[in-house]
């Protein structure tokens, strides 16, 4: 039985180009130059960064215009400019089919330069730009590499719920979930059933607690899931809806194991991307060993700096974005693990590492600041003097044959912004960014 085959993509074409091959490609005209006797059009299909130059006759290109979606059949030939180090191949068009055109002078994605701020106002159309395509391919291949890394370490990918009855981080920055117009729904008219579920429900800020339950049955687990935080933040690092990679490991007994896992994961991703011909100027530095220091050492180093701080570093206070970036960009010029934070500024589930500290770690990276955070988790019931009442189920994990364990969470959008460099805003690393005061489509 003949099976329908998807058309050849430019990505597959560039992997194995053959001079003289008859091919058919689909894509969009990214630029066009019409001369007296010939026309040159650059066509891209979004599957790779490299477009294909199409050579046509003036007659063939009469209706061809910028932005048109096309199918072009022809012969692949060695380009006349190949010896100059330019594109090696070009397509000599024999047949052109135009699917759609842009016949509106008000089309916002013109050939002129548009700032990221302007493009952010039209997220449904900015996806057509070369820069956004490059970022989302980087995101896709990064996620693929992350999954390959965890598979190589015998992790199980899981899907914990995104509707939850608790605030894992305890910060209170949650979105409450309620059905629309519940007063019209007869099932909610009884006094004893005021909620769709039997209690208040929220969009999750972290799947960590559910992952811990999974880890205590599957040993090593991870998820790549959406998370939601109702933060009143207008920074280049914050989103209301974002994606988190979270991992939990049973029988983890030291922070060194956790930091090694985090460092190995990101370096594996970098190496995988470079094998696929991705590269950014700052990546080579990232493959060198990273710095690890305690929170107390970080405060000591920052306090010794002769600088006017917006928020002076003080033991017992959290590190600000200014402190984080100064540590990794100025003092050490490399990613920095900061460990053993004061217990009073960290969530209830973190294991003690001293009289006033917990076995927590934050990974700080240049341009972004905090990229990931994790900890060893409390693993004995008597360690929980106080806890939210809705988390009685979580205490059952300690009650019934618990094991030492730890884990971390990493923001995907921050990771892509970090990999992309050039102080990329996280709003450029997700297709339809949601942030305070801004939602589109």
From Swiss-Prot:
**Does the record's keyword annotation contain Ligase?**
yes
A Pfam family that this protein carries is tRNA_anti-codon
Supply the alphabetized keyword list: Aminoacyl-tRNA synthetase, ATP-binding, Ligase, Mitochondrion, Nucleotide-binding, Protein biosynthesis
Substrates-to-products reaction catalysed: tRNA(Asn) + L-asparagine + ATP = L-asparaginyl-tRNA(Asn) + AMP + diphosphate + H(+)
Q: Which coarse location class describes where this protein primarily resides?
A: mitochondrion
Among InterPro entries, the record links this protein to: Aa-tRNA-synt_II, aa-tRNA-synth_II, aa-tRNA-synth_II/BPL/LPL, Asn-tRNA-ligase, Asp/Asn-tRNA-synth_IIb, NA-bd_OB-fold, NA-bd_OB_tRNA
Give me the Gene Ontology terms describing cellular component. Answer: mitochondrial matrix; mitochondrion
Q: What is its EC number?
A: 6.1.1.22
Compartment list: Mitochondrion
Q: Which domain of life is it from?
A: Eukaryota
Q: Which GO terms describe its biological process?
A: asparaginyl-tRNA aminoacylation; mitochondrial translation
Q: Listed GO molecular functions? A: asparagine-tRNA ligase activity; ATP binding; tRNA binding
Specify the enzyme's EC class, one word. ligase
**Is the keyword Cytoplasm assigned to this protein?**
no
Q: Which Gene3D superfamilies match?
A: Bira Bifunctional Protein, Domain 2, Nucleic acid-binding proteins
NCBIfam families given in the database record: asnS, PRK03932.1
Q: Which family does it belong to?
A: Belongs to the class-II aminoacyl-tRNA synthetase family.
| Protein name (Swiss-Prot/TrEMBL) | Asparagine--tRNA ligase, mitochondrial
Q: Corresponding gene?
A: slm5
């Amino acid at each position: 039985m003949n099976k329908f085959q998807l058309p050849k993509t430019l990505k597959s074409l560039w992997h194995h180009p053959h001079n003289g091959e008859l091919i058919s490609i689909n894509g969009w005209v990214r630029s066009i130059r019409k001369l007296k006797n010939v026309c040159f059009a650059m066509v891209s299909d979004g599957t790779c960064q490299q477009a294909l130059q199409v050579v046509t006759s003036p007659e063939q290109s009469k209706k061809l215009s910028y932005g048109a979606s096309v199918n072009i059949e022809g012969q692949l030939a060695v380009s006349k400019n190949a010896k100059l180090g330019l594109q090696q191949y070009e397509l000599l068009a024999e047949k052109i089919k135009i699917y759609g055109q842009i016949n509106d002078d008000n089309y916002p994605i013109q050939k002129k330069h548009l700032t990221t701020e302007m493009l952010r106002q039209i997220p449904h159309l900015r996806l057509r730009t070369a820069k956004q395509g490059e970022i989302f391919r980087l995101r896709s291949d990064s996620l693929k590499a992350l999954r390959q890394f965890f598979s190589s370490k015998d992790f199980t990918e899981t899907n914990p719920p995104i509707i939850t009855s608790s605030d894992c981080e305890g910060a209170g920055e949650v979105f409450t979930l309620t059905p629309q117009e519940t007063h019209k729904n007869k099932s909610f008219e009884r006094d004893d059933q005021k909620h769709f579920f039997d209690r208040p429900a929220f969009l999750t800020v972290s799947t960590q607690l559910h992952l811990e339950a999974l880890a205590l049955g599957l040993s090593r687990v991870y998820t790549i899931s959406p998370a939601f935080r109702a933060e009143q933040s207008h920074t280049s690092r914050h989103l209301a809806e974002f994606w988190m990679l979270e991992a939990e490991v049973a029988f983890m007994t030291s922070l060194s194991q956790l930091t090694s896992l985090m460092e190995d994961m990101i370096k594996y991703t970098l190496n995988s991307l470079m094998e696929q011909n991705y590269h950014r100027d700052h990546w080579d530095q990232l493959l060198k060993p990273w710095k690890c220091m305690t929170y107390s050492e970080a405060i000591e180093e920052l306090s010794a700096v002769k600088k006017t701080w917006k928020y002076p570093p003080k033991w017992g206070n959290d590190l600000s974005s200014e402190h984080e970036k100064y540590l990794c960009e100025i003092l050490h010029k490399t990613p920095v693990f900061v460990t053993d934070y004061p217990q009073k500024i960290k969530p209830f589930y973190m294991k003690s590492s001293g009289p006033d500290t917990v076995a927590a770690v934050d990974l700080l990276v240049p341009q972004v600041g905090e990229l990931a955070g994790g900890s060893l988790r409390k693993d004995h019931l008597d360690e929980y003097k106080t806890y939210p009442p809705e988390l009685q189920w979580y205490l059952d994990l300690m009650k019934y044959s618990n094991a030492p364990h730890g884990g971390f969470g990493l923001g995907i959008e921050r990771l892509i912004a970090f990999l992309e460099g050039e102080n990329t805003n996280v709003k450029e690393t997700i297709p339809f960014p949601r942030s305070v005061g801004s939602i589109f489509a």
